[in-house]
Amino acid sequence: SGQISNSDRRAVLDGLGTASSDYRHTIYKEDFSGRKGTLALSELEGFIDVALKHLEHSIHANKRKDGLYHAYNLMTVEADGGVQITYLPEMLEGQVAILSAGLLDASESVAVLDALKASALFREDQYSYVLYPNKSLPRFLDKNNIDPKALAGSALLTKLVEDGNADIVTQDCLGGHHFNGNFNNVKALRAALANLPSPYDALVASDQKDVEAIYEGIFNHKRFTGRSGTFFGYEGLGSIYWHMVSKLRLAAFEVTKAAVERNASSEVVGRLFDHYFEINAGIGAHKSPELYGAFPTDPYSHTPGGKGAQQPGMTGQVKEDLLCRFGELGVRVTDGCIQFDRALLNGEEFLKEPATFDYVNVEQQWQKLELPAGSLAYTLCQVPVVHLRGDTPGIEVKRGDGSTQQVAGLSLDLDTSRAVFRRSNDVVQLTVVA
């Protein structure tokens, strides 16, 4: 517990950073001995325990005052060798990471989701979340301006300006000074300093670090996040990146499921449910084409600020959506056995009136299944699963030979589960009562 000093942080960094190379150099020098030793299980457990404590400390140290969590730490090596940590602005992926880490309890997860909804990451018009908070970019004339005091404080820059040497800095018609526009990072600045004529050598030797500090003070390249912080489209400023929203949805599902399993209070579980279904509603499938900016059932990469969905095409988002949907429906697999759990199933999804369910069976034939009011159906490995409400949990297994089997409880045995997974046509329908 407690804070880690910059010097201690450097010591840990060096120790971890050189451990493998020290081992490798020992092997190069002495070769493998061929001898084998025994590592006690308690030693391995102790190592893992220490590692977990440091990981948890790192996560807790990244909690912000607003209840969110920092996503990225920026490292700066100070003049005395210490390592200083600073942070990028709040990011959606940081909140997804902490929720998915399994470290927070149900109440803490609610607090993160509440803070997220109240943050600059929430985009009201789409009722969803942007990757990073929107921001106003500086105008062109506001960029690359060297502060007059900083310029005057550098003997090298002052001398270059007096001599009319524009290799490092230039002066505009209004008297302002700017770094050479061809520099793309501090390495380019260093190369230009090294190539200055020899009369400047002494000034370069004494002022280089200060000049580099002035340069990075203006551009601060380590905080550059690419198109997300500079583009107006293509997942740029104010954009919702739908794959990350689906990751948030999955994280919210996971913490809600865990809260139910751990018997969290009904109030906390209810708030988690609310957040989960709000995130779900914001994703797009239930939106109008006008609001979504495209056909709502079509997959799109992102939605920039002020525009509809852009960049059509299937992304990795689909896997999170599938996991969430089967999770909502209550499909679980434990030790190879299919189980059903109605805890997260929205009661509004049950049919109000009888309906016909069309599906393709494992023999690639279209089938019709008549569903009563108060039921719902879906397929699992092309086997129809019909959910009915009831007080006595159970499963009816309909076999391919026409026989049926009644199962007490909501778990299938291993052989029946395998028959479903293998699409063997041994199981042709499951009716779940819960």
What does each of the following model-derived ranges do?
Residues 1-434:
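Acidic, mature catalytic/reactive cores of soluble proteins
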